[in-house]
């Protein structure tokens, strides 16, 4: 533990790292303040119905990603979701469209072009989602809440146009904040803003769960709450294991003599991640499962759509689980290219001991990926459906979302990624890092 705190002190001894952390903190504070700035012309005291509607289900998940801005009718209500949607679309285009696939191989210039395309697509998505969100406000909050319409005599059309422009500008500003953090701060800015939004909802969820369990008329509420926290801790540990787990494939490099120096002759490893797809399979699966939820609202007979639309029901979670496994294999197959890996290995004079270069190496890597993807996809599916089980066992909806799913994996993934970036700065300045073989180095002293 002493070593861990010494490492924390070392962080502030590095001027560049200190400035980057300060810059990141400043922009995060600006983002969080903006999440509480209500759209002009709306009475903030009349948002109870909107906050209730955005506290559960898929909308609740989106509200969590925005840090509660969606439920506050904030100028940052759309948050970074338009940018995330655009990034996913561009990423998919890079898998199937030759032009985008070519851009991915052009290094920094190709990356800049793809970033520019992502920005343009973000603006297009904002132009669609902005008016849709303003229209949803009219159905979620009472007409008296629109002060600009009632007191100033504005028409609904005029107010909607002004509010839409403000919402769109707010979302573009959030995108800019994320890019500034990436360039001049620490971590991936967009991911960090999502993580901050999720963390910001955690105290509210804990307070709500604490209140329910301690105000219950039945005995054992306090004990149940403690058990919940213990289970939650083990789920977090499992999520960390899923994000960090890799299968190391040994690679031997042949010796080369250039001039008077000898190169190669060392053994390295290719780290094949157990969950190479990250949270993308959950996002794709949730996008598909949104359709039965939407159709169930108009299904008066409570038939098939209503059955599949029950996100705590058996069939919803069974199909959700199967879709995650399918999408994990699909996304891993299109993002991990064994042929390219084998060619790069051969070009650099490397080979896998006991495996012939070329086709045999491709088959070996493909076989390894298939084997490690199966347990990874099943584990990912289990974590994704844990919130539904938590709700069925009596956990509050808000707190249940932290028991697994996209929010927990994003939380764990972004924190680990940020720690690894800080680690690289420390190691470059010859300080002990925060992490050691994927674990916090300070643990060894506990």
Label every model-predicted segment.
Residues 1-104, 109-446:
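N-terminal cationic and glycine-rich segments that engage phosphates or anionic surfaces
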